[in-house]
């Protein structure tokens, strides 16, 4: 075993209900094995690494690290920084003109005496970590980078289950359980529940499934109008499945006529190509982030779907609600805590072996929990619409299954 002298932890990208739990789990595991190993946490993700801004993990922090399990978010802070996007790093004042952000980051790790870097983030964070690991190896820095995969989308190849996704689905279901009662406030109400998921419908589908489990456990009073039908999910739209707007409008109008409301779950990535084409045709700029991704909050797919359907189904009022920030900023649930603990424990074990990679259940190797090689990590894993539970749900809510759509990342 090659004992690390100093370990650094950073979180990056958007939030997911696992970050604090993962930070706490890593600190606790290192402390259990050898409390003499120094730990620092870079403030604000890769931004903190570039600027040399970090928190020391003191004895008091080690003692109370378990407190982090109770809170959502990331106490050490996140940022969206791509080390290979030199222009953006210069523009944001993170490096000087002419500097290579990867070299600045590597030199800062050396300056801080770090020999193990733990990155906790999604596909962008871990591809950035992969680039940094390759740079370190090419230039003989002798540092090990170990990633933990967080994303509410559950869309990272070849990882079976990303950290935080189960919790996000559960929290999105809880969110809509309150919102859905708004159908009492107005006749012929259309409620659109927009769920996070850039190019992957897993979270939308899983949120709908978790929500329907809540309905399964509920008690109803149809004699006074409290029916499951009015609380039901009437349609689920994901990027990987084609949508026949006219046919769906006809079906949903029948639901509206019968139940007096329609509840739609839609992925924020569904219909984006059509929306972007519409924006470009009008000469409008399509906003993008540092990684080149379309800023979905500016594109507003839920609003677009609401506008498409409202007139066709005869809605008197349309309500569009987004559960994304509510869900992603939650503390981890029990299932995720268990997954996070097992991944963090293996990450520490890999640190002692100086084994780089992203910790996860490898779908290409029998779903074994291991350090997956960085070059094999990539985003954009689509949701499999042929999954049994998804097909059963579509059948139960009376929604015809659309054809498969190839989604781009």
Swiss-Prot record:
Optimum pH is 8.0. It holds the Pfam family PFK. Mg(2+) binds at residue 123. GO terms for cellular component: cytoplasm. InterPro entries: ATP_PFK, PFKA, Phosphofructokinase_dom, PKF_sf, PPi-PFK_SMc01852. It comes from Methylomonas methanica. The lineage of its organism: Bacteria, Pseudomonadati, Pseudomonadota, Gammaproteobacteria, Methylococcales. Diphosphate binds at residue 14. Its main location: cytoplasm. Homodimer. Non-allosteric. It catalyses: beta-D-fructose 6-phosphate + diphosphate = beta-D-fructose 1,6-bisphosphate + phosphate + H(+). The gene is pfp. Keywords: Cytoplasm, Glycolysis, Kinase, Magnesium, Metal-binding, Transferase. It comes from the Bacteria. It is an enzyme of class 2 (transferase). The keyword Kinase applies. The record marks 124 as: Important for catalytic activity and substrate specificity. Its cofactor is Mg(2+). Catalyzes the phosphorylation of D-fructose 6-phosphate, the first committing step of glycolysis. Uses inorganic phosphate (PPi) as phosphoryl donor instead of ATP like common ATP-dependent phosphofructokinases (ATP-PFKs), which renders the reaction reversible, and can thus function both in glycolysis and gluconeogenesis. Consistently, PPi-PFK can replace the enzymes of both the forward (ATP-PFK) and reverse (fructose-bisphosphatase (FBPase)) reactions. PANTHER family: ATP-DEPENDENT 6-PHOSPHOFRUCTOKINASE 1. This is Pyrophosphate--fructose 6-phosphate 1-phosphotransferase. Pathway: Carbohydrate degradation; glycolysis; D-glyceraldehyde 3-phosphate and glycerone phosphate from D-glucose: step 3/4. Gene3D superfamilies: 3.40.50.450.
């Amino acid at each position: 075993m090659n004992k690390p002298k100093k370990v650094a932890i950073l979180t990056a990208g958007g939030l997911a209900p696992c970050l604090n739990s993962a930070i706490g789990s890593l600190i606790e595991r290192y402390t259990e094995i050898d409390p003499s190993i120094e730990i620092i946490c870079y403030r604000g993700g890769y931004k903190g690494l570039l600027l040399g801004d970090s928190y020391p993990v003191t004895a008091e922090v080690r003692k109370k690290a378990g407190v982090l399990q109770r809170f959502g978010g990331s106490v050490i802070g996140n940022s969206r920084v791509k080390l290979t996007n030199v222009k953006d790093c210069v523009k944001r004042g993170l490096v000087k003109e002419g500097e290579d952000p990867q070299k600045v980051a590597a030199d800062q790790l050396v300056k801080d005496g770090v020999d193990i870097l733990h990155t906790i983030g999604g596909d962008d964070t871990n591809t950035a970590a992969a680039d940094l690991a390759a740079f370190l190896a090419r230039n003989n820095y002798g540092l090990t980078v170990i990633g933990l995969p967080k994303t509410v989308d559950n869309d990272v190849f070849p990882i079976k289950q990303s950290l935080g996704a189960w919790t996000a689905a559960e929290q999105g279901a809880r969110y809509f359980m309150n919102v859905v009662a708004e159908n009492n406030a107005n006749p012929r109400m259309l409620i659109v529940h927009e769920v996070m998921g850039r190019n992957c419908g897993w979270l939308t589908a899983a949120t709908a499934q978790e929500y329907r489990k809540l309905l399964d456990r509920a008690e109803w009073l149809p004699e006074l109008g409290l029916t499951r039908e009015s609380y039901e999910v009437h349609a689920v739209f994901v990027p990987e499945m084609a949508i026949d707007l006219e046919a769906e409008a006809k079906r949903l109008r029948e639901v509206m006529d019968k139940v007096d409301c329609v509840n739609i779950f839609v992925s924020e990535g569904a219909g984006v190509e059509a929306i972007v084409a519409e924006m470009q045709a009008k000469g409008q700029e399509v906003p993008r982030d540092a990684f080149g991704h379309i800023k979905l909050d500016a594109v507003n797919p839920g609003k677009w779907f609401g506008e498409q359907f409202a007139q066709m189904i005869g809605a008197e009022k349309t309500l569009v609600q987004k559960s994304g920030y509510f869900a992603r900023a939650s503390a981890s649930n029990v299932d995720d805590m268990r997954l996070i603990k097992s991944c963090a424990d293996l990450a520490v074990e890999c640190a002692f072996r100086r084994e780089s990679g992203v910790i996860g259940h490898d779908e290409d190797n029998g779903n074994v929990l291991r350090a997956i090689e960085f070059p094999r990590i990539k985003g954009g894993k689509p949701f499999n619409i042929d999954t049994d539970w998804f097909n059963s749900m579509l059948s139960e809510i009376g929604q015809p299954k659309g054809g498969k759509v190839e989604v781009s990342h």
